[in-house]
């Protein structure tokens, strides 16, 4: 009962997605199931951490921080799981379809021509710096909001987590990798941010889940929430949001159609999340 009283709306999203992925794996055929049983163990551990953080939550103690930040952190784990499980329904990706759409929109795909035409190692690094900044603006504006207004923070995290989870489900039924295979031809080893991004993708971001771009969706949502909270100072976040949008294409992580779709879903989920939060925040 104490857990029920302390639980917030976002906790139900985390609990559902933990169990959702676990159930999907458990109903697979035995040989396939064994390949992914580590995800079941991870999700049960995540579910346990969630319950403990809710149960142990006291005002401003360690578990209070864990409780409120855990849903956003969980997205890092669930992305890896969803992009790994994206071949359960369709063995092949829809990249050929997306590449054709991309060509219809831009003619020559932008990811093939931007870096070669600009031909600047400095701009290549700058674009990868913007792409890397995604991992900062996902957390830094939220941290400032958390320290000033926890109610608004809960609204923001609910919206972003809802967007991520529904996108992850979509990735599992519509697999796509994006033009990431072009990166080695376009960028070489680089100096700072290019090798950093190679390192990140080597550890956890193994590719997949490219359409729509959650980098674009999430950064746009962070900007929209920041605009409502910080108002005049939100332009700082806006610069990074615009930079991330350009970088997704320039750095050959996404087709143009991926990033445009990310703008649309980011805006739609911002509206949807606010509506759902206002309606259900007191129901749980």
Regions of interest found by a model, annotated:
Residues 65-72, 138-173, 237:
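Interfacial segments of alpha-helical transmembrane regions
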Residues 140-147, 216-234, 264-273:
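Membrane-interfacial alpha-helical segments at the cytosolic side of multi-pass membrane proteins
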Residues 81-96, 163-188:
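Transmembrane alpha-helix/helix-exit interface in multi-pass inner-membrane proteins
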Residues 122-137, 206-225, 260:
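Membrane-interface loop-to-helix entry segments
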Residues 2-42, 62-137:
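N-terminal transmembrane-helix/juxtamembrane module of multi-pass inner/ER membrane proteins
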Residues 169-229:
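Membrane-interfacial catalytic/cofactor-binding modules of polytopic membrane enzymes
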Residues 2-6, 29-35, 54-66, 145-156, ...:
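Membrane-interface helix-boundary motifs at transmembrane edges
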Residues 178, 210, 243-269:
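Interfacial helix-loop-helix junctions of multi-pass membrane proteins
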């Amino acid at each position: 009962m104490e857990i029920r009283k302390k639980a917030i709306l976002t906790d139900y999203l985390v609990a559902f997605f933990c169990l959702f992925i676990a159930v999907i794996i458990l109903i697979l055929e035995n040989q396939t199931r064994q390949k992914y049983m580590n995800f079941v163990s991870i999700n049960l551990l995540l579910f346990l951490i969630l319950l403990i953080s809710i149960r142990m939550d006291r005002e401003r103690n360690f578990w209070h921080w864990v409780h409120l930040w855990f849903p956003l952190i969980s997205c890092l784990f669930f992305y890896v799981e969803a992009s790994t499980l994206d071949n359960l329904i369709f063995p092949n990706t829809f990249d050929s379809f997306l590449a054709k759409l991309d060509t219809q929109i831009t003619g020559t795909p932008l990811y093939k021509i931007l870096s070669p035409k600009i031909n600047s190692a400095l701009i290549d690094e700058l674009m990868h710096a913007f792409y890397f900044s995604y991992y900062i603006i996902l957390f830094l504006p939220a941290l400032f909001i958390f320290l000033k207004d926890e109610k608004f923070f809960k609204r923001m995290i609910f919206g972003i987590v809802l967007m991520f989870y529904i996108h992850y489900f979509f990735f599992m039924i519509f697999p796509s990798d994006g033009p990431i295979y072009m990166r080695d031809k376009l960028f070489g080893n680089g100096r700072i941010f290019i090798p950093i991004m190679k390192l990140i993708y080597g550890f956890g971001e193994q590719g997949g889940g490219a359409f729509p771009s959650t980098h674009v969706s999430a950064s746009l949502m962070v900007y929209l929430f920041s605009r409502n909270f910080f108002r005049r100072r939100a332009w700082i976040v806006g610069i990074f949001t615009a930079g991330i949008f350009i970088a997704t294409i320039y750095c050959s992580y996404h087709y143009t159609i991926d990033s445009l779709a990310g703008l649309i879903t980011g805006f739609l989920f911002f509206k949807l999340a606010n509506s759902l939060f206002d309606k259900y925040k007191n129901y749980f």
